[in-house]
Amino acid sequence: MFDKAERSSFKYWFAHWRSFNMVALNQKCWKFKYLFHDMEKPFLNLILPYKTLQKFHRFHNKHHSEYYFLQLGKYHKCDNYDYEATIIDLECSHYTKTNCPRNAKQEVDTQYLIYKNNESKYVKQIVEKYSDYFNEIIDENGNSRYIIILVEKFYQNLYEKLKKIGLN
């Protein structure tokens, strides 16, 4: 198990990579592309500070919600989001991270509850983070029914994938 300070190490990346592929194999949803999961991280870690690397990774990989919302903001759609890899990533986290005791289902439930309890705050954070892209769909109060629908769809798809993989 690794704590936050150790996550920039090659040792952590390799443990995460093995865990990710192990979960995919155990759930019978492994794909060849999973051999390349987070493959850029150890190389970029040689030239970038970890925080910069982490941000770059999350905005450029199809299994992170940051990628999903950036694509929605830019193109008003995200047809290529990898829900399955997201679920596998969430599931394998509790094998490698000390501060992630929850499995994928518990993590999705927790994140969805945070969203439902603070819907307007959650949407506001998305709008602020991606303000360059979402300006035209926000009303004068800073709200957007469109974003709420997209967030609901995002969680609905995560729950469907949890069920399909067998982690519900």
Annotate each language-model stretch with its function:
Residues 1-168:
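Metal-dependent phosphohydrolase cores
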